[in-house]
C-alpha cells in the first residue's frame, strides 16, 4: 500500500503517488476540485476510503446531495456523508495500480491535503474483480477531462 511505503521511506504519501511508474498516476487539476467531486456522482456507487493514520473508514456509496457550508463542501447522499475542507486540498490524481491484496488493477481518484496525506480516495474498482469496460471508460473520461496541464 502506498501509505505503508511512504512511512517506510519517511515521505508524504503524495510523493509515493507522484513516483508511480508508467503513467499509473495522472495528476488532476485540483483547482477544479468542486467540478471534479461533482463529476464523481456520474460514477454511481464507488468505494470511498478515508484514513487519519489511526483509523481507516471504508464505505460503498454514491456521490450526490452537494452543498457548501462555511469552509466545507458537503456530499450528503443516502449512502455517503462527507464534509471536505476544500481549502486543504492540494493535489488530486487518477490512479491505476495493482491492488495490494490480489494484484488486480484498481482505478481510483485520490485527493491529498497540504501535508501530502490522503484526504480521501474514491475507488471505481475494488476487491479483485477486473473492471467492466464501462467503468474503465468512466475513469478514462475523468482522467482526460481533469488532467493537470
Task: Label each region the model flagged.
Residues 1-149:
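Eukaryotic intrinsically disordered, low-complexity regulatory linkers and tails enriched in Ser/Thr/Pro
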